[in-house]
Amino acid sequence: MKKMNSFLLIAISIVALNCASCSKDDSPVTTTPTTPTSIAPGNDPNFTIVAHSDEGFATFNRKVVVFGIDIYAVAAVEDIKLLHAANVMAQYLDNNEDGAVDNQAVLDKMLENRAFLVMWATENDINIDPPAGRLGQDLGNDETNPLFVANGKTGEFDAALEEVLHIINNAGHSFAYPEAFGQNIGSDLANAMDIARGGQFLTIPSSYPAGAWYTYDDTTCEYADCQTIEYLYWALTSMMGAQENRLDDISQEWDLNTAALVQSTDTAIHALLTNPTYNMPTVLPDGTYRQ
């Protein structure tokens, strides 16, 4: 799976997103705000595509705002996929779809961190210079598949289910509940991950112990800013059913591809994710928020 990309409280220096499964041009570009132009609003009943002049995102010609969170897209990103990402974010944050977020503390931290998602069509699209203090995540146009869930969770996976969840977890849960979802050693999440990996590995081991069920081996994925968030994604989406038909595709990283396997094998993460304090989503987003 693609390594989670995040902006970690960026200083004034230019920062570019990186991706473990693809080679993205690291050369920075300088951007300036653009004057909004006419943008087709789309046909979603809940979200409107708008032009913007937000600092640092000049190469992204439009955006959708979900509960105050910006989702930017370059011109080559299809409207249907931009709106799909917006609906997925809304469904993760308001999983019972009653019009109010399920965990206000998580959203508050996302807003405090000025969280954002950027949607790109080519690798060069994410050579950006966001303002200091923003946390972000990227999602590709071609890896977004609005029909994955509708088609019985078969066919090409919908990366929106992963990347949108990453920014919610990274900018929201990790800050709202550092003892539970913090990404450093000693949090409940990290402790559960250490069990799942068969030990506490600050760097990727040459091989994981027999019996480990989380075996991510990307050497660019560090313990505190990647491994924990990937682990959280695997566990939560497996509990929601996203991985039930994908074992052959994911077994090199994750073995517990069903809710039953997570519950019976990874009791620590199951207990954390079902703790009512955190009101984690239980229904897999399908991109049809309140429809």
Language model regions located:
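Sec-dependent bacterial lipoprotein signal peptides
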Residues: 1-20
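A general structural signal for short secondary-structure junctions and capping/turn motifs
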Residues: 2-3, 107-111, 222-225
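Bacterial Sec-dependent N-terminal signal peptides
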Residues: 15-46, 291
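Catalytic-loop region of hydrolases
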Residues: 44-55
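Acidic/His-rich structured neighborhood in mature extracellular/periplasmic domains
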Residues: 59, 66-205
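Conserved aromatic-histidine-acidic binding/catalytic patches
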Residues: 73-80, 152-156, 217-229, 253-261
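Post-HExxH zinc-binding segment in Zn-dependent metallohydrolases
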Residues: 172-248
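Pan-zinc metallopeptidase signature
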Residues: 232-291
